[in-house]
Curated annotation (Swiss-Prot):
Protein's recorded name: Acetylglutamate kinase
Physiological role: Catalyzes the ATP-dependent phosphorylation of N-acetyl-L-glutamate.
Organism: Acidobacterium capsulatum (strain ATCC 51196 / DSM 11244 / BCRC 80197 / JCM 7670 / NBRC 15755 / NCIMB 13165 / 161)
A single GO molecular function term of this UniProt record: ATP binding
Species classification: Bacteria, Pseudomonadati, Acidobacteriota, Terriglobia, Terriglobales
Annotated positions binding substrate: 41-42, 63, 157
Principal place of residence: cytoplasm
Pathway where this protein functions: Amino-acid biosynthesis; L-arginine biosynthesis; N(2)-acetyl-L-ornithine from L-glutamate: step 2/4
Site (Transition state stabilizer): 6, 217
């Protein structure tokens, strides 16, 4: 089977959870699956920007990205975070290749048109998964940072959830899994929803049951399902160990998002 796993949030900060996620990915490959690992790094980027004396601003869960912030994102996401994940997989004996979405023209972006303007924030408009296929043939894991190249030659910061959905659609993944720092999607009563359909997402958004970073995440879930991805699940990163059992056993952690 073909998996796209998105890792972000505090999972990248906690050494134990970080390694548990890497181990789960390595176990999937050991079991014969093809895995692409897409990552964010918003916490690390915010910290670096603060060290540079720059405040972070978010609108509807998306980071406002001027040229300086974009350059910092290139450094942090495609550099420090990406190579840390490659190293973690390598320490487990699993070969990995670190990439940005712009490498090999795997993903092409255009500036996201929003009001107010978000700056160098992009959305994926084209993809070419041949590099991913080549890496999989070597029994390795492509590790992809959420940076993509525009047709104008500029790099764009892409929401990592949206990047993961685009990756899953491009390679026709059997499953897209978001490993995150929340236990799942909370309903109006505050309890974790074990499943929801794409038709429920606009309603939950309009009633403000979901907000902040969960908005683009659920939007990404919807796009993935509408573009042929078979399964989408939001899973707490501390439950990453269930990944190898996701399609062969009953898993109750997190929230399953379904097409209908």
């Amino acid at each position: 089977m073909k998996y796209v796993v998105k890792l972000g949030g505090a999972a990248l900060e906690n050494p134990e959870i970080f390694m548990a996620c890497a181990r789960a990915v390595a176990d999937l490959v050991k079991d014969g699956h093809q895995v692409a690992l897409v990552h964010g790094g918003g916490v690390q980027l915010t910290r670096t920007l603060k060290q540079l004396g720059k405040q972070s601003e978010f609108i509807a869960g998306l980071r406002v990205t001027d040229a300086e912030t974009r350059d910092a994102a290139l450094m942090v996401l495609s550099g420090r975070v990406n190579k840390s994940l490659v190293a973690a997989l390598g320490s487990l004996g699993q070969a990995a290749m670190g990439l940005s979405g712009g490498d090999g023209l795997i993903f092409r972006a255009r500036k996201k048109r929003t009001v107010p303007d978000l700056g160098f924030v992009g959305e994926i408009v084209a993809s070419d998964p041949r590099w991913l296929e080549a890496i999989w043939k070597m029994n390795a894991v492509p590790v992809i940072s959420s940076i993509a190249l525009g047709f104008d030659g500029e790099y764009y910061n892409v929401n990592a959830d949206e990047m993961a959905a685009a990756c899953a659609a491009a390679c026709r993944a059997d499953a897209l899994v978001f490993l995150t720092d929340v236990p799942g999607v909370r309903g109006a009563d505050g309890t974790i929803m074990r499943w929801l359909t794409v038709d429920q997402i606009p309603v939950l958004s309009q009633t403000e049951v979901i907000s902040g970073g969960m908005l683009p995440k659920l939007g990404a879930c919807r796009e993935a399902l509408l573009n042929g991805v078979k399964r989408v699940r939001i899973l707490p990163a501390e439950a990453a160990h269930v990944l190898p059992d996701l399609c062969s056993a009953r898993v109750t952690d997190g929230t399953e998002v379904m097409a209908s």
